[in-house]
Every structure is written in structure tokens, then in C-alpha cells.
């Protein structure tokens, strides 16, 4: 209900619109001044009418019900709104970016006061290295800047959709983002792959299984880490990919749906089946030796006590392996890219490769085709130069 307070010749009308996360009341107000010559009775009647009209405007959104709402105070509502729309790990990444970057830079501003200029300054500060999560002071890569910007854009779009602001100041048409430049996909050449596999023979059996499955299935690291022995069909030579592993700070390791929320079966070669059988037998020996100290369940990839590995373990183990063997450093995800590229180079159907990798859209798989086409153009130019040289010598 609206409250009316007389201030000199004017009347202040205030409408409560709830409380922010700190318990502070949120209020929208207006000032009404009577026309000269109005009687006291007319003024009383008119100010009540104005109060009723103003309250209706606040309630139906014509006037923002949270005109004083700050960005930092809106964020808890935003996070609740998008919960369920994005994955658990994405939500945690959003929280980290919001906590360490967005709130320190813009959280003090009222939603209605945020302009494209504020967003542009934020983007520029990320690009220049003024804002860093790790305090290094180095500029973020364009792709990283764009990811952080998308979070801010999403917050303000949510506020716009709820009619808390008249427009989204972070609209992509209003903000200049750093150019992406040419995007390259990390892929192992056949020679690099051969050298890596040779070094792999000296590693633990579990790590050998991990890397061979990564290459042969193209699975994401979280999907591999989440594998259980029940997912392996030794007779059909297939692996059932239905979940992914994730870890939130302060909480135990958990599983979730795959990135596309769909399961898939992936065929693997006979030698991988043999490796898996050897590792299963070795794991059984470890379990027997540990006895009651065994904490595992049915996981394929385990820690020393049998419990499941961390979702980040494949990356850390792979990085350590490359360093110890003085091999070129590439991300663990490069094995997935390599798997897709080798299949396409060998003539596999792109739709089949897309399904095998668990891509939601075939356009995602197309980036590997572009890489292959570029390599083919380079090869064509090399051959062309050779033939041209031969023709010149002949002349």
C-alpha cells in the first residue's frame, strides 16, 4: 500500500516493492504538487488518487518496482532464475566470474543506471588486463573476454526480460568486443601421436587405458572419468556414455548428464578391450590387497584407495606425462580433436563422427572438416610448387 507524506507544499508518495538480499526495503517514490487554488478537501482526494495510480503503475511494470535495485542485489535472483537452464558446472563458473569480476566492477551500480559505456569499460579492462581473476595483470584472450561478457549480458538480459530495465545495455550491437582472430584447433599429427604412444608403454596400465580410450572414443574428460565397469560391454566392444563427472568446491565428486543430455554407445577396437580386461584384473588385485581400506565402487579410473578420480585428473595426469617425456604440450582435449580429425581424414561419415563425439549439432563437427580442408590446400600448394619447379627445369 502506498504511503503519503506532506513535505512543505508537496506530497511524497512511496510504494514498497520488497526487500533486497541484505534485508533492506526497496522503495519507489514520486512527488506530487497540488495546483494553486485547490481546497484542502480537493488536495486530499487528488493525492489519494495519485497514490493509487502510482501504485498501479509500479505493480504493472510501467514504473520499475525496483528502481533502486543494485546489480549486486539482483544477482541472487538471476542465479535462481537460470538454475536448471544451464549445467551445474556452468552455474559454478558463472558464480565465480560474478563474484570475482562483475560485482567488484559493477555491483555497486543501480540496474537502471547501467549504460553501454559501463559495459564497454568493463570489456576494455578485461582486454587490457586491468581486471584479472588471478592478479597477473596480463590481458585476457579475446575468447575469454567474450565468455565473461556473455555472463554479464545474460544477467542484464534477465533483468530486461523481467522489465526491471527498459533495455539491455550489454546488447552485442552496442558493445565492441575484441577480435577473435584465426581460431586453431589443437590436433596431434600422426608422427606426434606415434611418438606419444611409444612413450605411453612405460606408463601405468590405468593411464594407458585412459589415453587409448580418449583417442579411440573422442570422449570428453568428464565422460571418461565417470566410466564404470558396467558401462563396458566386452562382448559387443562398446562403451556406454551416459554421464559426466564434476566437482564443486566444498562438495563431493558427483555425476551429471552428458553435455547434450543424451547417452550414446561408442565402439572400440579389440586392443582396447584387451587393455581394459588387463586393467580390470589388476584393479581387482589392488582391491583385494587393500581389503577394508578400499573405498571404491565400480569405477574404471580410480585413486589409490579405489575412489573415483577427480574430473580434472585426466588433464593433470596428461600434462605431467607430456612434461616427463619432453613431448610437445597440448591440452587433453586435443585427443578428442585428434580422434575426430583422424576419422574424417580416413573417410568416416561426418554424421557418424558427430554422433560418436556426442555433438548436439553437426555444425560443431564441421570445424574439423575446415581444418582438414586447409591442410589439403597446403598440400595442394606444395605439390603445385613441385610440379611448377619441374616444368621450369624442363624448359
Where are these regions (language model features)?
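C-terminal secondary-structure termini that scaffold catalytic or DNA-interacting sites
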Residues: 236, 249-263, 267-272, 278, ...
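Basic, Lys/Arg- and aromatic-enriched nucleic-acid-binding interface segment
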Residues: 138-142, 146-148, 161-227, 235, ...
Amino acid at each position: 500500500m502506498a504511503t503519503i507524506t506532506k513535505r512543505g507544499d508537496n506530497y511524497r508518495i512511496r510504494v514498497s516493492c520488497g526487500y533486497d538480499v541484505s534485508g533492506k526495503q526497496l522503495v519507489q517514490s514520486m512527488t506530487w504538487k497540488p495546483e494553486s487554488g485547490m481546497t484542502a478537501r480537493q488536495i486530499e482526494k487528488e493525492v489519494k488518487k495519485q497514490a493509487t495510480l502510482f501504485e498501479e503503475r509500479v505493480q504493472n511494470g510501467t514504473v520499475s518496482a525496483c528502481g533502486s535495485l543494485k546489480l549486486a542485489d539482483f544477482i541472487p535472483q538471476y542465479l535462481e532464475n537460470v538454475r536448471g537452464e544451464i549445467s551445474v558446472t556452468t552455474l559454478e563458473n558463472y558464480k565465480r566470474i560474478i563474484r570475482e569480476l562483475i560485482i567488484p566492477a559493477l555491483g555497486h551500480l543501480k540496474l537502471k543506471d547501467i549504460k553501454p559505456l559501463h559495459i564497454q569499460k568493463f570489456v576494455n579492462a578485461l582486454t587490457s588486463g586491468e581486471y584479472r581473476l588471478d592478479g597477473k595483470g596480463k590481458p585476457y584472450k579475446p575468447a575469454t573476454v567474450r565468455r565473461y561478457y556473455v555472463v554479464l549480458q545474460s544477467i542484464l538480459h534477465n533483468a530486461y526480460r523481467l522489465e526491471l530495465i527498459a533495455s539491455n545495455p550489454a546488447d552485442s550491437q552496442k558493445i565492441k568486443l575484441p577480435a577473435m582472430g584465426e581460431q586453431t584447433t589443437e590436433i596431434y599429427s600422426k608422427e606426434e601421436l606415434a611418438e606419444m604412444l611409444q612413450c605411453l608403454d612405460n606408463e601405468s596400465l590405468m593411464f594407458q587405458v585412459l589415453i587409448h580410450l580418449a583417442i579411440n572414443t573422442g570422449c570428453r574428460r568428464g565422460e571418461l572419468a565417470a566410466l564404470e565397469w558396467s558401462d563396458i560391454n566386452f562382448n559387443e566392444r562398446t562403451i556406454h556414455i551416459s554421464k559426466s563427472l564434476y566437482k564443486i568446491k566444498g562438495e563431493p565428486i558427483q555425476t551429471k548428464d552428458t553435455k547434450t543430455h543424451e547417452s550414446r554407445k561408442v565402439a572400440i577396437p579389440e586392443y582396447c578391450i584387451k587393455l581394459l580386461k588387463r586393467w580390470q584384473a589388476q584393479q581387482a588385485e589392488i582391491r583385494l590387497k587393500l581389503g577394508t581400506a578400499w573405498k571404491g565402487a565400480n569405477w574404471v579410473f580410480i585413486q589409490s584407495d579405489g575412489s573415483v578420480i577427480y574430473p580434472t585428473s585426466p588433464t593433470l595426469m596428461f600434462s605431467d606425462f607430456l612434461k616427463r617425456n619432453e613431448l610437445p604440450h597440448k591440452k587433453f582435449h586435443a585427443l578428442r580433436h585428434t580422434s575426430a580429425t583422424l576419422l574424417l581424414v580416413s573417410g568416416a561419415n561426418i554424421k557418424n563422427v558427430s554422433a560418436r563425439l556426442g555433438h548436439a549439432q553437426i555444425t560443431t563437427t564441421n570445424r574439423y572438416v575446415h581444418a582438414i580442408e586447409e591442410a589439403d590446400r597446403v598440400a595442394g600448394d606444395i605439390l603445385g610448387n613441385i610440379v611448377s619447379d619441374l616444368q621450369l627445369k624442363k624448359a
